[in-house]
């Protein structure tokens, strides 16, 4: 008796994947992997950019704090240079490399050492950087070197000007038209000092410090 042929079931016909299905699955997986990698790369890039922006903000804030502390504690104490010559308490002409040089108070002394609370500082604009200088003592001995600290980089320009007792802004101090040259007892300290920083990324930062 002939054996009847049973039709194959749909289950038997669908065991496994065709080559086309495998190719499509691989393509979808590759696209998803690329999208996932791109998303991760964007996250990492954004995180790095955010950290750089935060570091820059902290640098600017710390620098402004130091500048403000220096100028707000300016004192009328003239000094002697390494040659014994008297220099003004505040001057823009002591050194061609310095924007300004002055005496300030408030030097910390947590160990109660036998030293003055006054210190001599200066600011330089060098290679797109604002550099702060501080000398170990007020009256410099021959060969005395200042400690240099870079405060801000990526600077386009720095300008400092001084408000005299006639309410006129001066680019130099002591003002050249007063004839004063050696001490702030002859040329009184300015009424105010303006500092303008032009940053390549943040633009202009302007600070005005009133002198007591």
Which stretches of residues belong to each language-model region?
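Extracellular Ig-like/FN3 beta-sandwich strand-entry sites
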Residues: 190-192
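N-terminal single-pass transmembrane signal-anchor helix
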Residues: 2, 11-40
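Intrinsically disordered, low-complexity regions enriched in Pro/Ser/Thr/Gly and acidic residues
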Residues: 103-188
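Short acidic/polar inter-strand loop motif in beta-rich domains
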Residues: 202-204
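Edge beta-strands of extracellular beta-sandwich domains
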Residues: 206-210
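Short, exposed beta-strand-loop hairpins at the edges of beta-sheets
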Residues: 194-200
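Extracytoplasmic beta-strand-rich oligomerization domains located immediately C-terminal to a leader/signal peptide
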Residues: 35-141
């Amino acid at each position: 008796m002939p054996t009847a042929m049973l039709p194959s079931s749909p289950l038997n016909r669908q065991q496994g994947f065709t080559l086309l299905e495998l190719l499509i699955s691989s393509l979808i997986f590759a696209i998803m992997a690329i999208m996932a990698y791109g998303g991760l790369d964007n996250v990492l890039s954004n995180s790095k950019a955010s950290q750089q922006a935060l570091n820059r903000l902290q640098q600017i804030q710390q620098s402004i704090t130091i500048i403000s502390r220096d100028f707000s504690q300016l004192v009328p104490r003239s000094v002697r240079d390494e040659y014994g010559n008297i220099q003004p308490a505040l001057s823009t002409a002591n050194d061609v490399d310095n924007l300004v040089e002055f005496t300030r108070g408030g030097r910390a002394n947590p160990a109660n050492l036998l030293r003055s609370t006054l210190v001599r500082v200066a600011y330089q604009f060098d290679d797109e950087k604002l550099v702060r200088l501080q000398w170990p003592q007020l009256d410099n001995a021959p060969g005395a070197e200042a400690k240099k600290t870079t405060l801000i980089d990526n600077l386009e320009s720095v300008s400092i000007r001084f408000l005299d007792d006639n309410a006129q802004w001066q680019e130099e101090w002591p003002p050249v038209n007063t004839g004063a040259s050696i001490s702030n007892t002859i040329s009184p300290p300015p009424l105010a000092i303006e500092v303008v920083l032009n940053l390549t990324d943040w633009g202009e930062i302007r600070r005005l410090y009133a002198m007591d």
